[in-house]
């Protein structure tokens, strides 16, 4: 049944799912995502957005937030929370020019509460702390440099990720071009964004959404283009993945993986993280048709009654993988060929210089938790801006929240490195453990956070570094460690060897059993424990790993082999078993 028919009760393939959720009413009545956002912008009595607009601004790339550190104090003073918005830019493949960077640096300095640029796991940047009077200026500033934030949140296809591989320059360029094409093809066609934020002309006549439908998708939808053997984008965190298959340095097609996703809800066993299923191989010329077919099948078959079960991963488990795949083949007019062979061998960023096959040099900078700000003794934000003033190539934001200074000619390497070192952007002493640890934003800005993540991780990693040293593990040894402040999973903890999921202030669920390459879901080992208890558990487990492991055996693989945790093979069956 098509999403455009708007029945009062949803039925899919003969199964009644229930009455449509209120979010479906909201989208249907929004006049293609316009709502009354323009009227809200004029209301200076409150710093926030009201009623449906609170949800609708997400489709325009923004979340309403407030500073939770001062929420209680403002309440005592009879003030509303310090409402502001976070904006996530649409940057397919994460490539940004020096000119664009200097513009976003200036806006962050002059018009945000926190003055920072936050690189994210969605391979883009976020502004945090933009007050209502500056929101339209923000969109117009971005538009003037060729950037927008259309569909980086909400029930749509979000920012399309692409492996940040500067070495395989020709293959990366081709894959990146497909990431851009997919992003444009699946973008909402409504004129609402231009009308509201860019003072665009209001054109009479109906909007149409041929792929997304008038009710858009049942839930968020995430897409990647990945170049093996590097799984930096974490394919199993995403609804739709195009695995690049190359021959002689040329892209010839994609293996298509569908139905990954990490979000869950505490206490609801109908929700779980899930690996993506391999549908098979397609030639390049069928890429956009297949992307649209997967999206439209999820549009029509996804659960619009229960948002907790609305993502593609649950649709596949409900209707069956083969049934979903057959529908995609029917809609795209193709038959999937057997998948071509590939292997993932890594997913962390290689920090430092590498030389591409095109002779250009690329410097990957480790940005702890993606926060680009001038810290005491480490003026990172100033440093990146100074590099941008002289850099002749581009920047590439990675899905690991780092930044690549890409396309540096040999005669400029020394200048770029000197600028990076003098501003604290290169630290030769940073450990492999710190490089391979990651956290989402969480407090104080994320309204969903249940526990600290970004502010918690640096000192926690220091403790873990001490544990590794205590057990005489080599300096290059590390554990993929991730912290996410709530079970929505932005920090991708559900693909880590050690994953911490926030449960309450100072308390986390401890998950073990993921692997280094991001192809296995970890399982809960201990529930609702403190950071002190977590470190005690890690100390004991690392001690066993150091003394009992096989040659080259990763921590996650060891926990499975040693029987410390059971392997999750089929999430619906195994994750809570």
From Swiss-Prot:
Residues given in the record as [4Fe-4S] cluster binding sites: 440, 446, 486, 490
Cofactor note: Binds 1 siroheme per subunit.
Cofactor: siroheme; [4Fe-4S] cluster
Binding site for siroheme: 490
Enzyme Commission designation: 1.8.1.2
Pathway(s): Sulfur metabolism; hydrogen sulfide biosynthesis; hydrogen sulfide from sulfite (NADPH route): step 1/1
Keywords per UniProt: 4Fe-4S, Amino-acid biosynthesis, Cysteine biosynthesis, Heme, Iron, Iron-sulfur, Metal-binding, NADP, Oxidoreductase
Biological process, per Gene Ontology: cysteine biosynthetic process; hydrogen sulfide biosynthetic process; sulfate assimilation
This protein's record includes keyword ATP-binding: no
Transmembrane segments: none
An annotated Gene Ontology molecular function: sulfite reductase (ferredoxin) activity
Keyword Amino-acid biosynthesis: yes
Reactions catalysed, as given in the entry: hydrogen sulfide + 3 NADP(+) + 3 H2O = sulfite + 3 NADPH + 4 H(+)
Domain of life: Bacteria
EC top class named in words: oxidoreductase
GO cellular component, one term: sulfite reductase complex (NADPH)
Pfam families hit by this protein: NIR_SIR, NIR_SIR_ferr
Quaternary structure annotation from Swiss-Prot or TrEMBL: Alpha(8)-beta(8). The alpha component is a flavoprotein, the beta component is a hemoprotein.
Family: Belongs to the nitrite and sulfite reductase 4Fe-4S domain family.
Function in brief: Component of the sulfite reductase complex that catalyzes the 6-electron reduction of sulfite to sulfide. This is one of several activities required for the biosynthesis of L-cysteine from sulfate.
Name this polypeptide is given: Sulfite reductase [NADPH] hemoprotein beta-component
């Amino acid at each position: 049944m098509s999403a455009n028919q708007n029945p009062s009760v949803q039925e899919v393939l003969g199964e009644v799912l229930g009455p449509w959720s209120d979010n479906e009413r909201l989208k249907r009545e929004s006049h293609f995502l316009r709502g009354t956002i323009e009227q809200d912008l004029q209301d200076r009595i409150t710093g926030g957005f009201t009623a449906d607009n609170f949800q609708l601004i997400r489709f325009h790339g923004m979340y309403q937030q407030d500073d939770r550190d001062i929420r209680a104090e403002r309440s005592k003073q009879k003030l509303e929370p310090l409402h502001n918005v976070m904006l996530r830019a649409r940057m397919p493949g994460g490539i940004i020019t020096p000119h664009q960077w200097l513009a976003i640096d200036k806006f962050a300095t002059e018009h945000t509460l926190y003055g920072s640029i936050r690189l994210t796991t969605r391979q883009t940047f976020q502004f945090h702390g933009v007050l209502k009077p500056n929101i339209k200026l923000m969109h117009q500033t971005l538009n003037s440099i060729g950037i927008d934030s259309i569909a980086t949140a909400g029930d749509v296809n979000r920012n399309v990720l692409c492996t940040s591989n500067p070495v395989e320059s020709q293959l990366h360029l081709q894959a990146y071009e497909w990431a851009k094409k997919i992003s444009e093809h699946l973008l909402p066609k409504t004129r609402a964004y231009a009308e509201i934020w860019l003072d665009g002309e209001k054109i009479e006549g109906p909007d149409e959404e041929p792929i997304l439908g008038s009710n858009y998708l049942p839930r968020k939808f995430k897409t990647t283009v990945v170049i093996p053997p590097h799984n930096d984008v974490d394919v199993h965190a995403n609804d739709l993945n195009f695995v690049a298959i190359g021959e002689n340095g040329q892209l010839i097609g994609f293996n298509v993986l569908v139905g990954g996703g990490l979000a869950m809800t505490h206490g609801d066993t109908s929700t779980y993280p899930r690996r993506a299923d391999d549908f098979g191989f397609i030639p390049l010329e069928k890429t956009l048709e297949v992307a649209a077919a997967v999206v439209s099948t999820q549009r029509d078959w996804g659960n619009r009654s229960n948002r907790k079960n609305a993502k593609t991963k649950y649709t596949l488990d409900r209707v069956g993988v083969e049934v979903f795949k057959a529908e995609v083949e029917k809609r795209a007019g193709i038959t999937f060929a057997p998948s071509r062979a590939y292997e993932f061998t890594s997913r962390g960023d290689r920090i430092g210089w590498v030389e591409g096959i095109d002779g250009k040099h690329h410097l990957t900078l480790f940005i702890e938790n993606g926060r680009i700000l001038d810290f005491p003794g480490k003026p990172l934000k100033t440093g990146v801006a100074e590099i941008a003033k002289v850099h002749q190539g581009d920047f590439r934001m990675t899905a690991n929240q780092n930044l690549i200074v890409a396309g540096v000619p040999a005669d400029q390497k020394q200048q770029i490195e000197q600028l990076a070192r003098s501003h604290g952007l290169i630290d030769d002493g940073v450990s492999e453990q710190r490089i391979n640890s990651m956290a989402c934003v969480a407090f104080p800005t994320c309204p969903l956070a249940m526990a600290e993540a970004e502010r918690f991780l640096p000192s926690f990693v220091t403790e873990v570094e001490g544990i590794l040293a205590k057990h005489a593990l080599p300096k290059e040894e590390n554990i993929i460690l991730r912290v996410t402040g709530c079970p929505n999973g932005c920090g991708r903890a559900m693909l880590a060897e050690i994953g911490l999921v926030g449960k309450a202030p100072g308390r986390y669920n401890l998950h073990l059993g993921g692997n280094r390459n991001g192809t296995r879901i970890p399982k809960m080992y201990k529930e609702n424990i403190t950071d002190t208890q977590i470190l005690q558990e890690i100390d004991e487990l690392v001690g066993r790993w150091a003394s009992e492991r096989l040659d080259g055996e990763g921590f996650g693989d060891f926990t499975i082999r040693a029987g410390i945790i059971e392997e999750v093979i089929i999430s619906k069956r195994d994750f809570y078993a």
